[in-house]
Structure formats: structure tokens, C-alpha cells
Amino acid sequence: MKKIILSTLVVFSLASCKKESQKNEEGVATTDSTTILNKTEAAKVELKEISQQNLVENLSKKNDTLYVTNFFATWCGPCMMEIPHFKKKIEELKGKPVKFTFVDILDKAAWKDKVPAFARENNLENHIVLVDESKFDDTFFGNFKTWKGNGIPFTHFRKGDKTEEVEGSMSEEMLNEKINSLLK
């Protein structure tokens, strides 16, 4: 009997620890202000959805600017591991002819809240675009030497006629090496 009572108390205690909302003195449920703030802040960030054609045009530009295009998703651990390296490079190369673009292609449902919140949190609002991956076809993947859309992160580098591609997460050293080799 003691085990049953003890088990019930433990379950009740654990269940009460999960506080999503609380009731005020009048018995009206209220929501945690940080939850409201995060949703409000995410709503303020308006990310741009672009077409496959626009993305291909951006990937194909051949001029003196270095274009670094990273395909990612907010739920992807390896993608998130390399974001600090990209942020550091963006800051370091500010004012130089380098354009960083992050393409969120997966989980369209996250485009309303998770991706904008991520963009705001990482100060990447001006670097993230949204592309519906379901519209990618063989023609789209023909723009890459190796990538067929089978994994992320994937980073495409282009300056003039030179291109580099990296499938998988990059270390800071590898990112620096790729960028420096194309900026020469």
C-alpha cells in the first residue's frame, strides 16, 4: 500500500512540475510571458520565400562576389554545429564582396515560428531564405557536382567560374580554407 501511495505522489509531483500555464487569483489561465515574447519576436521576423528558379539564379551568378549558400534545417544537429562558424565569418567579412545565404528547405511547418525565432536569435534575418524542397527536381540538382538533396547541411561556394561544394558539417578551419581559397 505504501508503494502505491508513494508511486502516486511521485507521478503527481512530476506532472505538476510541467508548468505550461498557471491560474491567477480569479482562476483564469495565464501563459508564461516569455512564451508570448518569443512568439511575438518570431512573428516580427519576416523571412523571404523564394522559388527554385530564383535560387538557381542566385547559385549561378558569375562575378567577383563570393556566394556562400548553405542548405540547412533548424532541427538538424550538424547544421546547427556549423552556424557559429558562419556567423563569425559573416562578421569578419562585413563590407567585403561576400554574400552568405542560408536556405531552409525542410519542415515548412517551422517557417512560421521556429525558423524566424532561429533567425532572430542568431542575427541571420537578412541571410535566411525559404525554399519549398518538394518542388526540387533533377534540373535543380543538376546545378551541383555532388549534391542530390540526400542530406544536409550542404554548402555551395561560387566566385566567378569557380565552385566548391561541401556535404556535411564543416569545422571552422574547413570553412576558412574554402572561403580563403576562393577569395584569392
Locate the predicted segments by residue.
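A short beta-strand-turn-helix
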Residues: 46-66
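Conserved redox-active cysteine motifs that mediate thiol-disulfide chemistry
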Residues: 71-87
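Thiol/disulfide oxidoreductase modules built on the thioredoxin-like
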Residues: 133-180
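Structural microenvironment flanking redox-active thiols in thiol-disulfide oxidoreductases
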Residues: 83-122, 136-141
